[in-house]
């Protein structure tokens, strides 16, 4: 609950802390956590599975987005990267459906920065499907295609699955990144956005070298 509150309440103190660097040698129990109940990994052979749990409305996820995007590009074929939107409350669900709808249309990577900016810069919170469709239309997305995806059984199934993953991975705050179904980290652990990328580098390398 403490991590959830720190995620949802943006403070100047935490924002300042996020600019600090993480220790050079990441430590278990501080910079990352070994999950008590590791989860199955579905990454292709030779790749390390990395899952980011996030919420479009989370200010820290918005701050973290450029870093995680750059980190994923840097890792390239080393990792199998996935995102899972979380809904700690029912009023978060429209954002989960938004993510899976744009993913179904194959435009998630293209529109995610614009969605974050709309919510956090323009204060257009995109809490209804109509508001989402209207906004995405400004990004060149066909409203009908979006609404069809939003209301589809497949998108609802993805939302239901994300709720299960939230429990299975014991996620209590975002952004949280899980490496290889077992190692959990994020800015709430490292108190640093750049430091989180360093810890992710460490975890991926350790998994690759079979040291973790």
Swiss-Prot record:
Question: What subcellular locations does the record give?
Answer: Periplasm
List cystine links.
Answer: 58-61
**KW Cell membrane (keyword) present:** no
Record the organism. Burkholderia cepacia
UniProt KW keywords: Disulfide bond, Periplasm, Redox-active center, Signal
This protein is called Thiol:disulfide interchange protein DsbA
Stated role: Involved in disulfide-bond formation. Acts by transferring its disulfide bond to other proteins. Involved in the production of protease and alkaline phosphatase, motility, metal resistance, and multi-drug resistance.
Q: Which InterPro entries match?
A: DSBA-like_thioredoxin_dom (IPR001853), DsbA/DsbL (IPR023205), Thiol_disulfide_DsbA (IPR050824), Thioredoxin-like_sf (IPR036249), Thioredoxin_CS (IPR017937), Thioredoxin_domain (IPR013766)
What is stated as this protein's family in its record?
Belongs to the thioredoxin family. DsbA subfamily.
Signal sequence annotation: 1-21
Q: Which Gene3D superfamilies match?
A: Glutaredoxin (3.40.30.10)
Q: What is its main location?
A: periplasm
GO cellular component term, pick one: periplasmic space
Give the Gene Ontology MF terms in alphabetical order.
Answer: disulfide oxidoreductase activity
């Amino acid at each position: 609950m403490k991590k959830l509150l720190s995620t949802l309440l943006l403070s100047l103190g935490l924002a300042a802390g996020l600019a600090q660097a993480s220790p050079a040698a990441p430590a278990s129990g501080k910079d990352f956590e070994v999950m008590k109940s590791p989860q199955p990994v579905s990454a292709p052979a030779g790749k390390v599975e990395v899952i980011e749990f996030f919420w479009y409305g989370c200010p820290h996820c918005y701050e973290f987005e450029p870093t995680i995007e750059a980190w994923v590009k840097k890792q390239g074929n080393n990792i199998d990267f996935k995102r899972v939107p979380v809904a700690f409350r029912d009023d978060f669900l429209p954002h989960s459906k938004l993510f899976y709808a744009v993913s179904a249309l194959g435009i998630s990577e293209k529109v995610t920065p614009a969605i974050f900016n709309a919510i956090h810069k323009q204060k257009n919170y995109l809490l209804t499907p109509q508001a989402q469709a209207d906004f995405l239309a400004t990004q060149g997305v066909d409203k009908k295609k979006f609404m069809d995806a939003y209301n589809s059984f497949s998108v609802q199934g993805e939302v239901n699955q994300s709720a299960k993953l939230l429990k299975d991975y014991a996620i209590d705050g975002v952004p949280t990144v899980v490496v290889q179904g077992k190692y959990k980290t994020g800015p709430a652990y490292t108190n640093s956005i750049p430091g989180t990328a360093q810890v992710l580098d460490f975890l991926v390398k350790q998994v690759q070298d079979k040291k973790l």
